[in-house]
Each structure stands twice: as structure tokens, then as C-alpha cells.
Amino acid sequence: YRVGGKNAPLANDTKIAEFRRLNEAAIRNAERAEVLFDRQKQFIGNASHEMQTPLAVCRNRLEMLVGDGSALSEEQLGEIMKVQRTLDYLVRLNRSLLLLSKIENGQFPETEQVDFNALVGRTAEDMSEIYAGRGMRLSLREEGRLAARMNSSLGASLVTNLLKNAYVHGDAGGEVTVTVSGDRLSVCNSGAGGALDADHIFERFYQGAKKEGSTGLGLSIVDAVCRLYGLRTEYAYINRCHCFTVHFPK
């Protein structure tokens, strides 16, 4: 049983009254959990949506203050920049929460055939300079053609968040290898510290080690996209490398 997984009720044709009552109690508890889960999703979606405007207003006003820097001391400008960095983090966090809410509420009905070889190539090229800034080497291995029918924006989010995760949590000066084959997409990054908790790695806000610039939601977005389209996620720590793999139906 998985909350939000649209689980079908288990058949129970027992004639034993105690078992029947136990089954009825379990069904009631499951239904109550589903209602609470739906309310939580709705609250997060509504809250994230309502926060967009005030966050944008705060951001614009801070930019106006910085733009008129002549009226501020160097110390004041420094404090404003700190607030701006915190606000930028909140904006990214809010966008991620809103995206998660939309995915879970099925707000991406449009689908098309997504060419992951081309998508990974474009994304890797776009991020190559960012990787270079940390001295990281990004390599792409194509072992086959990979295509799947899904919303193109969500396909892009899937790839982007896997590559961002490798960048944020990978070793400076380390390597990131992206492998595309006929039925899987994997991203491996070198990283010390040992294996992460495979049972919780895709949960919201789980972080093996807090890293600046990370919202803790990237892998949750990956997992949400995969669950939406029936894909399987897998994590493994192999030869001092963290490997995240998405398995596609053959």
C-alpha cells in the first residue's frame, strides 16, 4: 500500500467476523489517509501558488535597493545581498514545490515521444560551463536509443534534475558520467562519504549532506515524474560513485 498510489481494495471473502471487521477497519484507515494526503497536496499547491507574487515583489524591491546603491553603505549592501540570496533560495524552493504539486495532481496531460538521447545531449551541453566552474568533467555514453512517450517539459525536468543533483553533490574536480541505453538512463557522480540511504534518497528534503544551492527536492521531482509514467528509479553506490538510474519499460 502506498498513499496516493490509487490502490485497489483487497478482496476479502472471509466468513470469520473478526477478520472481516479488521479488513473494514484497515480500509477506513486507508481511505482516511488518502483524504489527508489529498488535502496536504492541495494545501502545498495553493500555498506555493499564493507565494509566487509576494516573493516576486520582495525580489524586485531588493533589486531596486541594490540598483540605487549610492544611498547605501557597503555594509548595508552586503546585508541586502545576503537577504537576496535567501530570497532566491525561497523562490527556487517554491517553484519546485509548485512543480511537484502539479505533477501529483496530473496537470501535465499533453504527451509526445521524447528522444532522450537528444534531450540529454542538449542538457549536458547547456550545463557544461557550470560543471567546468567546479572543475568537473561531464561525459556522455550512448549505448542505444532511448525514447518514451511523456510530457516534454517533465522529460526535461527529469534529466535536468538528475544532472543538477550530480553537480551539487558531486566532488569538485570529479567526474559525472551519463549513460543512455535502450531501456535506462543513469547519472553517476564521484562522491566521498559512502552510500546514501536508498530507502529515503528520493523523499522530499532528504539530503545526505546539506549543500548550498540545493532545495532537497530535485530527486523528489525525478521520482514524481517516474511514478507518473510507471518508470522505476534505482540508487547504488559503486566504486565511490553515486549512481541514479531510471529504468524504462522495454
What are these regions (language model features)?
Residues N165-Y167:
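Short helix-loop "hinge" at the ATP-lid/N-box region of the Bergerat-fold HATPase_c
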Residues Y1-A47, M51, A56-L72, M81, ...:
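Membrane-proximal HAMP signal-relay module
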Residues L10, E75, N105-A118, R149:
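Short flexible loop/turn segments at helix-to-beta-strand junctions
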Residues G155-V159:
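A residue-level detector for a conserved hydrophobic packing site
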Residues I103, H200-K211:
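Bergerat-fold ATP-binding/catalytic subdomain of histidine kinases
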Residues G173-R184:
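Short beta-strand/loop element within the Bergerat-fold HATPase_c
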Residues E112, A132, R137-R149:
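Conserved catalytic submotifs in the C-terminal HATPase_c
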